[in-house]
A protein has these predicted regions:
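N-terminal signal-anchor transmembrane helix
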Residues: 135-197
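Acidic donor-binding segment of Leloir-type glycosyltransferases
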Residues: 190-233
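Catalytic donor-sugar/metal-binding loop of nucleotide-sugar-dependent glycosyltransferases
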Residues: 357-375
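Membrane-embedded multi-pass helical conduit in multi-pass membrane proteins
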Residues: 110-161, 424-519
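Long helical/loop segments within the catalytic core of UDP-sugar-dependent glycosyltransferases
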Residues: 217-252, 265-350, 390-401, 502
Length: 567
């Protein structure tokens, strides 16, 4: 602590310097950038008459010493880095439980007094959510179809490969209890075809994760890879670790990968070219995600189809419509200046990616979906799948609840159209699964079984509902067929009709997410990697199969349009 007072943490990180001791009356300061000696001297807070002695040390040693000296203070900053009005750290489960209890009591009272009214209201809400989700899906699909038909193959639209003049990338890879996959990860990242002097990879590990730290300690790390050890604290989440590591990154572009990821080798070059061509308002590029173990079992096949639908059809459509883009947790690349301007990640949100995408949109930034793919490991067992999906859905609910604390501000930031669309994108995405059993109950009507809705819905009404449900299923199948055009995905098409059954699991996870909102709002359900093929060779699998879709970044239909009617 006595050494730390001579150099502020922010200055130490910015200057790649750290006080390490004393030599007589001189303060010894180590740095890996001796060219910054003058700036280091200027930043030091020394008593009158005391001097500093600058010494040179490797960057990895500088980083480790900075963490030892400033780590606890930086960790506390990481926990509260996001602006209070955008953060869920003020979420009070007891207050939410009280509101839920009051709602349940009122519902029970209505059920006793006017049961038909309650039935009509609940089923009406379920139908509104269903129609909202279907409309958003249809609009995104139609937008993607129109754009694909107009698309011209890439012929040098973006600048040439930046080579040695490209931006410096800092790739953050959070690891927690990943001893089996850590060495495989290094092999996969080594395939990235980008100048090493303009690339650094920060492996972010928790202080108490002794197993992963031991594996990394024995690994032979290249000079462009560093280990960042995050001090213990609360909450123990991925966004907290990312906030902590951000201060140690030196790149102007911040990229995020997960432990099991295998990005395409030219991914960073594509991202660099697109950032060079896009304006400064384009703050984020989101890559596509796919699975290298899609054929592990039926669940992994259906999961791969869902990912193809999301990243190859719906998300590009959402982007072209000018709506807020809920980011994926990996293969996203951010301009550092924009990331810092919006306050980094919310350390308490367990779906930090979607929340950050919304916050970028609220601050006037754009996100583009870029046609480059990272292959990762599909969760191929039912219970782990439900745990993972519940975490995502809990984060969506939390993101919506925080944003709607001030609906007028959200309306002002997004505009009317994007405000309405956000309700479907975030709230309806979870509410649809919570209420789905109500709509499933209508399946008994073709068999002449009585239903509580019979009092308010006649035969014609049931016919209209049946038509809507069949049309929705047909739309989903059409989107899935479109999403699986790539050669390595076509083999998944025979199981597309089973997707409706697959989403039954999402209803189970949605109810678990709702319960966790009240009981364990900040708990991070860890996804285990390596159990379903995550440790296969770096070059194996479908990543080497040519994808027929052009590598050109997807154009945006937004172009700074704000939906005060249409974004």
């Amino acid at each position: 602590p006595r050494l730390a007072r001579h150099l502020a943490p922010a200055d130490a990180l910015a200057l790649d310097a750290v006080p390490v001791g004393r030599a007589g009356r001189q303060l010894v300061v180590a740095t890996c950038r001796p060219d910054r000696a003058g700036r280091i001297h200027a930043a030091l807070d020394l008593p009158q008459g005391q001097e500093a002695l600058i010494t040179v040390a490797p960057r990895a040693q500088i980083t480790a010493t900075q963490i030892a000296l400033y780590g606890e203070r930086l960790a506390r900053l990481a926990e509260g880095q996001a602006p209070q009005r955008h953060s869920c750290r003020g979420w009070r489960p007891a207050r939410a439980s009280g509101a839920f209890g009051l709602l349940a009591t009122l519902s029970a009272l209505v059920a006793l007094l006017v049961p038909a009214t309650l039935v009509a209201a609940v089923f009406g809400l379920a139908l509104i959510v269903f129609l909202g989700n279907t409309a958003l899906k249809a609009a995104a699909y139609a937008t993607t179809l129109r754009a694909d038909r107009r698309r011209v193959p890439a012929t040098g639209t973006d600048p040439p490969d930046p080579g040695q003049n490209g931006p410096v990338f800092s790739i953050l890879v959070p690891l927690y209890r990943e001893p089996e996959i850590a060495t495989t990860l290094l092999d996969r990242l080594a395939r990235l075809d980008y100048p090493r002097e303009r690339l650094e990879v920060l492996l972010v590990v928790e202080q108490d994760d002794t197993v992963t730290r031991a594996v990394l300690a024995t690994a032979k790390l290249p000079g462009w890879v560093r280990v960042i050890t995050v001090p213990q604290g609360h909450p123990r989440t991925k966004p907290r670790a990312l906030n902590f590591a951000l201060g140690f990154a030196r790149g102007e572009i911040i990229g995020i990968y997960d432990a099991e990821d295998r990005p395409e080798p030219d991914q960073l070059s594509r991202v660099a070219r697109r950032f060079a061509a896009a304006g400064s308002e384009t703050a984020c590029l989101q890559g596509r995600l796919d699975y290298y173990n899609a054929r592990h079992n039926l669940l992994s096949r259906l999961f791969a189809i869902e990912y193809a639908i999301w990243f190859r059809v719906l998300l590009p459509g959402v982007q072209r419509m000018g709506l807020a883009v809920p980011l994926g947790g990996t293969t996203l690349f951010l301009r550092r200046a924009a990331l810092e301007a919006v306050g980094g990640w919310d350390a308490h949100n367990v779906t930090e990616d979607a929340e950050l995408g919304l916050r970028l949109a609220r601050n006037g930034y754009r996100t583009e979906v870029i046609a480059t793919t990272t292959f990762e490991e599909a969760n191929a067992a039912v219970l782990p799948w439900i745990r993972q999906r519940a975490r995502w859905q809990k984060g969506y609910l939390m993101t919506w609840a925080v944003a709607m604390r001030s609906p007028c501000a959200l309306w002002r930031d997004l505009g009317p159209g994007r405000f309405v669309a956000m309700q479907a994108q975030i709230l309806f995405a979870v509410l649809g699964f919570l209420l789905a059993p109500l709509l499933w109950s209508l399946a008994v009507k073709p068999f002449g079984v009585a239903h509580p809705l019979d009092a308010v819905v006649g035969p014609l009404g049931y016919g209209v509902l049946a038509t809507l449900f069949v049309a929705s299923v047909c739309l989903s199948i059409a989107i899935a067929l479109r999403a699986t055009r790539a050669p390595h995905l076509r083999g998944l098409r025979p199981v597309i009709p089973l997707s409706e059954l697959y989403f039954l699991l999402a209803t189970l996870s949605a109810w678990r997410a709702a319960a966790e909102m009240l009981l364990r709002p900040f708990w991070w359900a860890k996804t285990r990697h390596g159990a379903f093929g995550g440790t296969v060779a770096a070059t194996a699998g479908p990543a080497d199969v040519t994808d027929p879709t052009p590598s050109r970044p997807l154009p945006s239909g937004a172009r700074r349009r704000r939906w005060r009617g249409a974004p």
